[in-house]
A protein has these predicted regions:
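N-terminal regions that are enriched for targeting/export leaders
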Residues: 25-81
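Short loop/turn motifs that connect adjacent beta-strands in outer-membrane beta-barrel proteins
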Residues: 45, 52-68, 101-113, 158-161, ...
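Residues that define the transmembrane beta-barrel architecture of outer-membrane proteins
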Residues: 50-51, 64, 78, 88-94, ...
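Surface-exposed coil loops of outer-membrane beta-barrel proteins
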Residues: 125-152, 160-244
Length: 244
């Protein structure tokens, strides 16, 4: 699967966070003194994020290494001729990612935590209407469900050139991907569906993250070496005659 943003996608660059941070009395919280100016009002025309700095909460969390990213991809696609039947369907994906820089949080140099959550929406045009092998959009998946995606710990070493990652991983985030294909919708532009179609349950790819470990050595901005070991049956043993 290519992690792409189609033209119909709605990109949200922030999420609401309802922790009653101002009700706390910890001395570690930021406070204004009489000599400090009041915070300026958030302005959507100049802010880097859609919902501003959440009244100062976003930069406070950033000081502790915590950041959020929320993306909503929405597609309305259809089959007008041939295939199984004709019709149009909606499919979408809500992608929430939370990152924590452990160096900022607890002083763990080179450490990072990452969690991805998926909210899969709508119907699958490929299965229900077309009957094709390579999915019409790269967010298609059944059933519609909220589930955990990637969740891993990473340690950076060798002046940040070597990364060791362990946890729940998706192979289609690391292999056989072209950055220039990320603007396209059809999954043929991303991770090879022919490879996924020949693995039980589609293999360790979206939306089924599996236990694994990965090492990546960055030689420079253009060259890197990646090696990993992952569970190849993310949905359990196959019930086919091959009995994977």
């Amino acid at each position: 699967r290519a992690t792409t943003l189609p033209s119909a996608a709605v990109l949200l660059l922030a999420m609401l966070y309802n922790t009653p941070i101002y009700a706390q009395t910890s001395s570690s919280l930021p406070r204004l003194t009489a000599d400090e100016p009041l915070p300026t009002k958030s302005d959507i025309t100049t802010d880097k994020t859609l919902l501003g700095d959440w009244g100062g909460l976003r930069p406070w969390l950033d000081n502790y290494g915590v950041s959020f990213t929320l993306n909503q991809t929405s597609d309305y696609v259809g089959n007008t001729r041939g295939g199984i039947r004709q019709g149009f369907v909606y499919d979408g994906l809500l992608d929430l990612e939370v990152d924590m820089d452990l160096n900022k949080a607890i002083g763990w140099r080179g450490g990072k935590l990452h969690i991805t959550g998926y909210g899969i929406q709508g119907q699958d045009l490929s299965i229900q209407y077309v009957g094709n092998l390579m999915t019409t959009t790269n967010v298609e998946s059944q059933p519609s469900i909220a589930k955990l995606g990637e969740a891993w710990f990473e340690q950076r070493l060798m002046d940040d050139h070597l990364g060791l990652r362990v946890g729940l991983l998706e192979a289609d985030r690391y292999y056989m991907m072209s950055p220039t294909a990320n603007v396209f919708v059809n999954s043929t532009f991303g991770f090879p569906d022919s490879w996924e179609a020949n693995m039980p349950g589609g293999g360790p790819g979206y939306p089924n993250a599996t236990p694994g470990a990965l090492a990546r050595l960055d030689f420079n901005d253009d060259w890197r070496l990646t090696a990993s070991v992952m569970n190849g049956t993310p949905v359990g043993p196959s019930t086919s005659a091959t009995a994977y």
